[in-house]
Every structure is written in C-alpha cells, then in structure tokens.
C-alpha cells in the first residue's frame, strides 16, 4: 500500500520556536514510517517542519499518489503536545486537501486522541488512539485487502454519522522490535544548515524509552502511557552508529520523558 506520512507541526508558524533555529526532525513520524516500510508498504514523507503552509502537500499528493495519508505527529517532541490552534487548523487543511483527491486519511496525535470528534468532523476517516504503530499496521493491512476495519483495536471512525470507538490497545513492551527510524526520508542537509547557521553545531534527536510513571501534564503519556519501557543498549547504539556514520551530528538530544 502507498502511504504518505506527514505531521502537523510547522516550526515557522511557531515564531518563538522558529527564532531559536533548533528544529528537530519528526522522530515519531519516521519511526512509524520505518515500521510500515519494514512490513512491505511503500512510504514517503511530507515533512512540515521547515515550511509555513499545508498547501505544499498538494505536490506530494499529486506526485506520490498515496492510497492513505497518515498525519502522524511526533509524540517525542513536547511542542506537539501543546497543540497550537494554527497547527490544528493546518492538520485540518491537509485532511481536506487529501479528501478532495479521494485519499483516505488517518490521524495520530495527542490532540486527535483527546479531540477525535474534531478531526472526524474535519474529514479524517480514522483517528488512531495513543501509541499507534501496531494500530496503523493492522489498519493498513485491512485497507490493502479491502477488509472491514471495525475490528481494529485503537481506532475511532464514523459509520453513517455514528462514531465508533474500538478502544485503546496496550502499549508496546518490546521496543527492539521496531526498526531504526527512516532517517533517509529526512532532508538532513536542510536541518544541518539551520542548526549551524543559528547555533554553530548540529543536533539530532533520539529516543531510548517510552512512557513515564509521573503525572506532568506536558509529557507524552497520552501517547505512550505511564508504563516505562526501554530499548536495549545494543539497539540504541546501532542507531547512534548509523547517525554518526551517515549524518555526522555533533550533539544528540535524548528526548525521553524521563
């Protein structure tokens, strides 16, 4: 299945953050993309981070011609959990542009998990609740086979104006089962140029754990829950080695909640 991944955080629309010149690639988005690609789906990425309008997605919709648009926000980035109204509206605009072309749309974010009716009202076909890699796998497999999706756990959808909520699934415990994020989908040079011009060094983001037992209201617990799960040291080192060999950052941000 051809799946176009995107997310709804536009750094230029957040003037305070854009002025810092410290954009990080959408880690959660490219993690999900890598997982679906590993399972045999054809994936592409429309990265919104460095642009200022959702209208540019039209080019990717026309050139890639996806069967499914997945707006999959980066749950590792705390900025995406303080959803700004303009970012939400940008997501709605992307949904509308995809639906205009007859493309099905799934959305995964902390905001859509909390406000799923707003996203369904905007035209989304599916809202994926919480941590969504396994949910998205089952959804994509069913869509590819034209099978019924109502039995897929972790989805909210509408059937004849009636909202159907299949309930949340438990979070993943074995994080080593996930591949290294699809860093090849990122225009690394564009990020490097901004970092070096604004800060004099180049930083990339990584996550080694998911979940946190504490109760801060800004973290990723709406997505990854309050059970603490970690990658093995070997799995983490493999990603560090990949990034150092291929992209040569001089700094890493470990964006774990704890």
What are these model-derived regions, one by one?
Residues 17-18, 81-85, 227-231:
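Short, solvent-exposed loop/turn segments at secondary-structure boundaries
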């Amino acid at each position: 299945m051809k799946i176009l991944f995107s997310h709804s955080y536009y750094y230029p629309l957040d003037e305070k953050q854009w002025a810092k010149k410290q954009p990080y690639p959408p880690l959660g988005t490219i993690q999900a993309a890598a997982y679906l690609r590993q399972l045999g789906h054809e994936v592409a990425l429309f990265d919104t981070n460095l642009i200022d309008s959702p209208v540019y997605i039209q080019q990717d919709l026309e050139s890639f011609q996806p069967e499914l648009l997945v707006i999959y926000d980066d749950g590792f980035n705390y900025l995406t959990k303080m959803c700004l109204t303009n970012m939400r509206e940008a997501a709605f605009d992307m949904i509308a542009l995809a639906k205009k072309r007859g493309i099905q749309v799934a959305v995964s974010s902390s905001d859509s998990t909390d406000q799923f009716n707003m996203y369904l009202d905007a035209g989304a076909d599916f809202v994926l609740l919480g941590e969504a890699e396994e949910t998205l796998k089952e959804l994509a497999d069913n869509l590819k086979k034209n099978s019924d999706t109502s039995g897929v756990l972790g989805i909210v959808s509408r059937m004849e104006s009636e909202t159907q909520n299949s309930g949340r699934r438990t979070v993943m415990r074995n994080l080593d089962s996930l591949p290294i994020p699809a860093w090849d989908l990122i225009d690394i040079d564009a990020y490097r140029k901004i970092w070096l011009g604004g800060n004099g060094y180049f930083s990339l983001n990584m996550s080694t754990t998911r979940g946190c037992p504490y109760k801060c209201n800004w973290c990723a617990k709406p997505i990854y829950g309050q059970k603490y799960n970690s990658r093995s040291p070997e799995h983490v080192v493999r990603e560090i080695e990949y990034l150092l060999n291929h992209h040569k950052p001089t700094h890493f941000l470990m964006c774990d909640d704890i």
